[in-house]
A protein has these predicted regions:
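Ribokinase/PfkB-type carbohydrate-kinase core domain
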Residues: 3, 8-25, 37-178, 182, ...
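Conserved post-catalytic alpha-helical subdomain immediately downstream of the catalytic base
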Residues: 154-158, 183-253
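Short alpha-helical
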Residues: 5, 29, 187
Length: 255
């Protein structure tokens, strides 16, 4: 976060939610996202970068990591050449007691391929939707003919593929069967932030000590709540997610 007004607002929200910011503030402000939503609820984002595109390896190395921590790095974090090097190399050097979640995100085509080659071998979980998976596979294949996303990952690492209203598909290892995690039925009002919500809920499940299959079911519940109302905010609470898991019923959390 920076010193500007947008950073101030985000910091206030984080403090209100009990989230500690571990990195020092930078001079400047965070970027801005303009979201375009069509009548069917499909969302497209236009992003301008800010201080978040200037991570420092020195600052990252000062973060105190503890056993059981989860680190999430998204493709959108690595679209800047400097950020791609700093984040991918830091993530690749994370200690084994930290779970690294890498999300491919719509910005996949803007990430230098070297960053993917650096970060994927360390990833414990790679999450993506169908389009993102296809785009990344094409990029890697063009770089090294015949290679796939799995070619760069450890055999024991997991992949999560989000498939919209069909939920998500989980593979716990290279030779493991694909497990379909069902979605929850919901009327879609707005898809803004649904991918981010799914990833965040999954990471929360991992932090709580759940197995990845349970964490993905939590993620599906959170995603269903996220699309039940207009706007990416507010994000679902733990109580709301638990209620969906218990009842199977999704209601608009703004009503």
């Amino acid at each position: 976060l920076g010193t500007g007004p947008s950073s101030f607002q985000v910091r206030q929200r984080l403090v209100g939610a009990g989230v500690e910011v571990l990195t020092p503030e930078l001079v400047g402000d965070i970027g801005v996202v303009i979201q375009l939503i069509d009548k069917g609820g499909t969302m497209c984002s236009v992003v301008t970068a800010g201080v978040e595109s200037e991570p420092s390896r020195t600052t990252l190395d000062r973060i105190e990591l503890r056993e059981g921590d989860v680190v999430h790095v998204a493709a959108s974090d690595m679209t800047n050449a400097h950020a791609a090097v700093e984040l991918s190399e830091w993530a690749a050097a994370l200690p084994p007691f930290v779970t690294l979640v890498v999300s491919v995100s719509p910005a996949v085509v803007q990430v230098p391929v070297e960053a993917w080659e650096t970060i994927l071998p360390r990833a414990d979980v790679v999450t993506m939707n169908d389009w993102e998976a296809s785009a990344l596979a094409d990029i890697l294949d063009r770089t090294r003919c015949g290679s796939t996303i799995r070619s760069y990952m450890r055999p024991d690492a997991a992949t999560v593929r989000r498939v919209g209203n069909r939920g998500c598909k989980l593979q716990l290892g290279a030779d493991a069967p694909i497990i379909t995690i069902p979605a929850f039925e919901v009327a879609i009002a707005d898809t803004a932030g649904v991918g981010d919500t799914h990833i965040a809920e999954m990471c929360a499940g991992i932090l709580l000590g759940h197995d990845l299959e349970t964490a993905c079911l939590m993620a599906n519940a959170g995603a269903a709540l996220a699309v039940s109302h207009e706007s990416a905010l507010p994000v679902p609470t733990r109580e709301q997610v638990d209620n969906v898991l218990e009842t199977g019923v999704v209601t608009n959390i703004l009503r």
